[in-house]
Amino acid sequence: MHYYSEQDIRDIVAAVVAREGGASVPSGEKVPVEASARHVHLTAADAEKLFGPGHGLTPKRDLSQPGQYLSEERVKLVTAKGEFSNVAVLGPLRKETQVELSLTDARALGISAPVNLSGDLTGAGDVVIVGPKGVVEARGSVIAARAH
């Protein structure tokens, strides 16, 4: 395995930016990056099943995608093959419950998850979502999301 120094990364970024004809990032400037390969989007009905009647989501911090946020709420994802605890729930609430995992996470849980754009549940896998107040059998909800 090769490890890159901060200077190596700066040099690589500068070379790519120069090749693509873009402007360079001034030295010392930070470029925000968010990566969340394991999270859940819930419907209002599923949020109530998991967290109790009348319970919505409690915003914790805004995400870089406008209108979206990380909530205080956390869930557990369970299959016959394994489980992940403390999984982030993102808001706002949606029309369909969606679970986004990395392909590695999906494989670890024994889920066949298609690589789809967020919101496209075509061929999506199944998982059980466990909250402090209830359980949701989320059929056709698991995808490995394309970068978005």
Predicted regions and their residues:
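Protein-protein interaction and targeting regions used for scaffolding, dimerization, and localization
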Residues: 1-29
